[in-house]
């Protein structure tokens, strides 16, 4: 089993229904969840400080492009972690996770690891990456820092394929780039513009003075130089049959 484009079995596909499989929540369950939320700290979730909307392309098939919503926690000056959803609505589905590191951290990674990462410079300068409803003046310093970062994004739920549950292994995602294979479909951008009442073109013009990174490591965006993507394959393996305690 690998992270390919094979459609899901009919009973797990959408068939026009995009809702996840399962019964509607009962009143009792709603009350239990509200009570639990009041009693527990949920500290990791409360560290989320940013919402970014952008687009991602499947590493093995870049014609498959999705709008993504990153809910970002900054761990330190060089490292961020993102819970990625397919929308910013209350019923948004958690479709993956992205880790973001500074260029300083990235340069210390092994070359084989670097191949799994993508650059952010074009994505941000072209205004494909936006922070919905946040004034550009407020987010500008953070965006300028992010142009020099690299991300590794694993998609765990291919909702664009019609999957009603997370199926199969994760798929590696890539960022948009200024070459034909990496360009985002115009209709996706126009749809987002209409939703938020923005002009991506106008935002792009406002970012024209953002500094370009002096150098983007060629191991990132591996497909641009080599025309190869990556898929995850699942294989049976022998277990270590040693008890963790006597």
Region roles according to the model:
Residues 1-79, 143-246:
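N-terminal domain-onset segments
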Residues 88-185:
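An exposed acidic His-Trp-rich patch
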Residues 79-81, 94:
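Short, surface-exposed beta-edge/turn micro-motifs
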């Amino acid at each position: 089993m690998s992270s390919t484009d094979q459609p899901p079995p009919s009973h797990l596909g959408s068939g026009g229904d995009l809702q996840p499989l399962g019964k509607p929540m009962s009143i009792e369950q709603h009350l239990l969840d509200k009570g639990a939320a009041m009693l527990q700290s949920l500290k990791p979730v409360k560290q989320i400080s940013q919402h970014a909307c952008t687009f991602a392309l499947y590493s093995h098939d870049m014609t498959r492009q999705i709008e993504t919503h990153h809910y970002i926690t900054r761990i330190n000056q060089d490292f961020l972690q993102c819970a990625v959803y397919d929308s910013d609505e209350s019923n948004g589905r958690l479709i993956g996770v992205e880790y973001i590191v500074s260029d300083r951290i990235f340069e210390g990674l092994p070359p084989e690891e670097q191949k799994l990462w993508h650059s952010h410079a074009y994505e941000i300068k072209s205004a494909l990456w936006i922070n919905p409803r946040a004034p550009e003046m407020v987010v500008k310093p953070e965006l300028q820092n992010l142009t020099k970062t690299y991300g590794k994004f694993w998609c765990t739920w291919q909702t664009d394929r019609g999957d009603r549950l997370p199926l199969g292994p994760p798929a590696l995602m890539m960022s948009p780039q200024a070459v034909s294979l990496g360009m985002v479909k115009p209709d996706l951008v126009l749809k987002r513009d209409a939703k938020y009442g923005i002009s991506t073109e106008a935002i792009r013009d406002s970012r024209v003075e953002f500094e370009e990174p002096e150098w983007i490591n060629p191991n990132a965006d591996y497909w641009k130089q080599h025309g190869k993507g990556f898929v995850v394959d699942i294989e049976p393996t022998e277990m270590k049959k040693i008890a963790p305690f006597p």
